[in-house]
Curated annotation (Swiss-Prot):
Protein name: Tegument protein VP16 homolog
Domain of life: Viruses
Lyase is among the record's keywords: no
SMART domains named in the record: Alpha_TIF
UniProt entry keywords in alphabetical sequence: DNA-binding, Host nucleus, Phosphoprotein, Transcription, Transcription regulation, Virion, Virion tegument
Binding partners and assembly: Associates with the VP16-induced complex; binding to host HCFC1 activates VP16 for association with the octamer motif-binding host protein POU2F1, to form a multiprotein-DNA complex responsible for activating transcription of the viral immediate early genes.
Swiss-Prot/TrEMBL GO biological process terms: DNA-templated viral transcription; regulation of DNA-templated transcription
Organism of derivation: Varicella-zoster virus (strain Oka vaccine)
Region (Disordered): 388-410
Gene Ontology cellular-component annotations: host cell nucleus; viral tegument
Family assignment from sequence similarity: Belongs to the herpesviridae tegument protein VP16 protein family.
Keyword Manganese: no
GO molecular function: DNA binding
Task of the protein: Transcriptional activator of immediate-early (IE) gene products (alpha genes). Acts as a key activator of lytic infection by initiating the lytic program through the assembly of the transcriptional regulatory VP16-induced complex composed of VP16 and two cellular factors, HCFC1 and POU2F 1. VP16-induced complex represents a regulatory switch: when it is on, it promotes IE-gene expression and thus lytic infection, and when it is off, it limits IE-gene transcription favoring latent infection. May play a role in the aggregation of tegument proteins around nucleocapsids during virus morphogenesis.
Amino acid sequence: MECNLGTEHHSTDTWNRSKTEQAVVDAFDESLFGDVASDIGSETSLYSHAVKTAPSPPWVASPKILYQQLIRDLDFSEGPRLLSCLETWNEDLFSCFPINEDLYSDMMVLSPDPDDVISTVSTKDHVEMFNLTTRGSVRLPSPPKQPTGLPAYVQEVQDSFTVELRAREEAYTKLLVTYCKSIIRYLQGTAKRTTIGLNIQNPDQKAYTQLRQSILLRYYREVASLARLLYLHLYLTVTREFSWRLYASQSAHPDVFAALKFTWTERRQFTCAFHPVLCNHGIVLLEGKPLTASALREINYRRRELGLPLVRCGLVEENKSPLVQQPSFSVHLPRSVGFLTHHIKRKLDAYAVKHPQEPRHVRADHPYAKVVENRNYGSSIEAMILAPPSPSEILPGDPPRPPTCGFLTR
């Protein structure tokens, strides 16, 4: 996530050795959570090695064929179903993930200038395989033996996940480029075919003009569609692998995590697909208020649907109550797919931000001289995720405020 953990060290003077908190640490019964081994089997989950490599896509193919090819290459048959689910969910699962714009800022296939985009297919590319299981250089830290080590441990977990995600994303960006070029070649071939047999003076120029229009009207929309599938797979795969290993290590030390005090300063940190602490058995607060059992059950329902380990909170879970509960859905609230799309759009816009260009064509017949070369990503991103915001409202593109992590002293 794009945040650093703030640290709270609650000394004896600060907490005045609260009897309630002391009782939490002393009376925590780790047997309530059962046997860790029977719960998850081992540190390696069924998601750990689902995808080894992905080949380059077909040299030229229609976007529809490329979409199906990407599903097969990723072994992601659940992808379309999950994207449909995101249409009926309101939670923000993704905006706390790092955007890593620097990976895209020089990717010319994302240029807003159609001439730049077309120039990327002027030379033949080498066929290559993409390793989609690249690991980061930072190992998953072990839980501390004493509560005093919890703040540093949580920060190390956060850093380890960020490094792992970035390493994997670098491979995914290369795969995205090859798919973009396949779309360009398809549009190029389509434009050339439309001029065959026409009695015109310069068929090549006519074909090029039509290709430019296709880039503006269709290319960016098709790229966004592929990117939604690709980055949903990236985020889920990395988060699943990392989280199940994390859950295995944290579940073995419930007594240490019973002394944890953790605050999600923003709700989107709580609804996020990645959590640095999955065994949050101490005092947990959401936006400064005690976390409710129903809120925990609802977010765990989404996590179960996504194949992620549940967040366990020993002080919040209710006896003999289910661990999950389906949240309600409102058509008037932002949708999960909108948050994902907005997040991906920040990546796709990175080239244009670094290489700003003056618009070359404007509508002369319109009083506002509207630019006609705006990229068309398809559905209105803003309409999917945003109501008219107040000045204080947190938007998906805003960097998250740091959550706070501390420990209870004996």
